[in-house]
Amino acid sequence: MNFYNIFVFVALILAITIGQSEAGWLKKIGKKIERVGQHTRDATIQGLGVAQQAANVAATARG
Protein backbone atom coordinates (compact mmCIF):
# COMPACT_ATOMS: atom_id res chain seq x y z
CA MET A 1 0.00 0.00 0.00
CA ASN A 2 2.88 2.34 0.78
CA PHE A 3 4.41 1.64 -2.65
CA TYR A 4 1.13 2.65 -4.29
CA ASN A 5 1.14 6.02 -2.52
CA ILE A 6 4.75 6.67 -3.52
CA PHE A 7 3.98 5.67 -7.12
CA VAL A 8 0.97 8.01 -7.29
CA PHE A 9 3.03 10.86 -5.81
CA VAL A 10 5.88 10.37 -8.29
CA ALA A 11 3.43 10.09 -11.20
CA LEU A 12 1.72 13.31 -10.11
CA ILE A 13 5.02 15.20 -9.85
CA LEU A 14 6.09 13.85 -13.24
CA ALA A 15 2.79 14.88 -14.85
CA ILE A 16 3.07 18.39 -13.43
CA THR A 17 6.66 18.73 -14.62
CA ILE A 18 5.93 17.46 -18.12
CA GLY A 19 2.77 19.55 -18.38
CA GLN A 20 4.64 22.76 -17.67
CA SER A 21 7.60 22.08 -19.94
CA GLU A 22 7.78 23.57 -23.40
CA ALA A 23 6.58 21.28 -26.15
CA GLY A 24 9.21 22.48 -28.64
CA TRP A 25 10.05 19.15 -30.28
CA LEU A 26 6.43 18.00 -30.21
CA LYS A 27 5.31 21.26 -31.78
CA LYS A 28 7.88 20.88 -34.57
CA ILE A 29 6.69 17.36 -35.35
CA GLY A 30 3.08 18.56 -35.33
CA LYS A 31 3.91 21.37 -37.73
CA LYS A 32 5.62 18.94 -40.13
CA ILE A 33 2.62 16.60 -40.05
CA GLU A 34 0.31 19.56 -40.64
CA ARG A 35 2.39 20.65 -43.65
CA VAL A 36 2.21 17.14 -45.13
CA GLY A 37 -1.56 17.23 -44.70
CA GLN A 38 -1.80 20.60 -46.41
CA HIS A 39 0.34 19.45 -49.33
CA THR A 40 -1.76 16.30 -49.68
CA ARG A 41 -4.95 18.35 -49.66
CA ASP A 42 -3.62 20.78 -52.26
CA ALA A 43 -2.39 17.96 -54.51
CA THR A 44 -5.77 16.23 -54.28
CA ILE A 45 -7.63 19.39 -55.22
CA GLN A 46 -5.25 19.99 -58.12
CA GLY A 47 -5.59 16.37 -59.27
CA LEU A 48 -9.37 16.57 -59.19
CA GLY A 49 -9.24 19.69 -61.35
CA VAL A 50 -7.05 17.96 -63.93
CA ALA A 51 -9.30 14.89 -63.91
CA GLN A 52 -12.38 17.07 -64.44
CA GLN A 53 -10.74 18.80 -67.39
CA ALA A 54 -9.76 15.44 -68.89
CA ALA A 55 -13.34 14.21 -68.50
CA ASN A 56 -14.63 17.34 -70.22
CA VAL A 57 -12.19 16.87 -73.11
CA ALA A 58 -13.18 13.21 -73.45
CA ALA A 59 -16.87 14.09 -73.43
CA THR A 60 -16.33 16.80 -76.04
CA ALA A 61 -14.31 14.45 -78.25
CA ARG A 62 -17.08 11.84 -78.17
CA GLY A 63 -19.59 14.45 -79.17
UniProtKB/Swiss-Prot annotation:
GO cellular component, one term: extracellular region
Residues recorded with modification Arginine amide: R62
Highest rank taxon of the organism: Eukaryota
Signal peptide: 1-23
UniProt keywords, alphabetically: Amidation, Antibiotic, Antimicrobial, Immunity, Innate immunity, Secreted, Signal
GO biological process, one term: antibacterial humoral response
Cellular localization per UniProt: Secreted
Family according to the record: Belongs to the cecropin family.
Its job: Cecropins have lytic and antibacterial activity against several Gram-positive and Gram-negative bacteria.
Name of the protein described by the UniProt record: Cecropin-A1
Taxon lineage: Eukaryota, Metazoa, Ecdysozoa, Arthropoda, Hexapoda
